[in-house]
Amino acid sequence: MNIEKSTMLSTALANFDRVCSLLGDEYSPDLLQKLRYPKERSELRLSPQFSDGRIHTIHAFIVHHSDAIGPCKGGIRMSPTVTLDDVTALAMEMTWKCALIGVPFGGGKSGIVADPLTLSPDDKQTLIRSFTRNARRNIHPLVYVPAPDMGTNERDMGYIKDTISYSLGYATTQGSYVTGKPVIMGGIPGRREATGRGVVLSTMEALSTLGGSIKGARVIVQGFGNVGAGAAETFAEMGAKVIGVSDVDEAIYDEKGLNVVALLEHVRKTGSLRGAGQGRVVSHDAILEMPCDVLAPCATADQITVKNAAKIQAKIIAEGANGPTSTEADAILAQRGLYVIPDILCNAGGVFVSYLEYTQETQQEQMTREEVLARLDKRMKDKFKLVHDTATTRKLHTREAAMYLAVRNVCAAHIARGALP
């Protein structure tokens, strides 16, 4: 298979190729080569009829990267710029993330080429239901279990669950076809904030490891969507000083600290950080280069590049987004001695709580928010320690250590299944 390399995919492949050199003596080249490519890539042509009366043609993609450990798991991204290669990279990253955090899932991802900001609520529902009908053979509790991602939310997951359940003649809350749903439909309390909270928990461990504390730590959060806003809120609750935030419209900075609660309320009312009335407005490039203890890129891929890696003044990079650091920039950060919490560890809180949702729905139980967060806290701390100790023992950078552990787990699953001799 000849995969055209996008920036996101080239970064994912470079991270994988780097760890293959560490695993070459443990596993066969054929097995490692197998993991370099997805199991299945599907392109869909959706034909929803929107409220304007027209039938629109919209492209969508589904990628199943690996199901060696369990059914594929990964969100549905809705964006006018998402590509098949992007979805392939994200599915591959989900394989490593699930293997590292220790949940019985493989990696998958979906992409819908549409701008959610230009769709009315009714048209978005129509599009999501059209996607579900066309993707029906791909979505199943034992095949691929979607979740929210950029441009989609828990309401959309409810539409997916309802569409499938209705077609099967099941009650809406029967069958774990999707996670990240509304709690009333079988979702789990704590899922919405799980990814952002995981970012903060791993950062707390990193600060402690380096002899610091979350109390008073100066934090900049890039991105103010579900992950970034959740992380900023939790950072503030834990005693950190959030001195900078940004979204697609505006970046603001105040070395004395921002009122995160007020920012969240402003965004809830207006949908944007613009006009928040706090701090001073800076450029989106500048916010990444301001002095701080922790920089949490929680927006999109390739935000830390060769152009700014040498200018970043943070001590810790907490990768709340998927693939926010390019391969070349990663080498610069490592050379400078910055502590990077890699994305497959840092933002794994979401898929861990999705696993809890999957299991509780299968068993027809209901966990409390306190139970969910307690289990999340322990898992993030345990896996951070494992990655840090592996990096120290094997003299690896943290990303290499995380990838080493993840890929080794997937290889072990393949061998246990007898997929290859």
Model-found features: residue ranges?
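Glycine-rich phosphate/diphosphate-binding loop of Rossmann-like nucleotide-binding domains
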Residues: 181-182, 186-289
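Glycine-rich, N-terminal phosphate-binding loop and its surrounding beta-alpha-beta segment
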Residues: 44-116
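Rossmann-like adenosine-cofactor binding region
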Residues: 250-340
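Adenosine-phosphate binding glycine-rich loop
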Residues: 2-7, 206-207, 310-421
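Flexible, glycine/charged-enriched surface loops at secondary-structure junctions
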Residues: 26-32, 102, 140-148, 172-174, ...
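Glycine/serine-rich phosphate-binding loop and adjoining beta1-alpha1 elements at the start
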Residues: 99-215
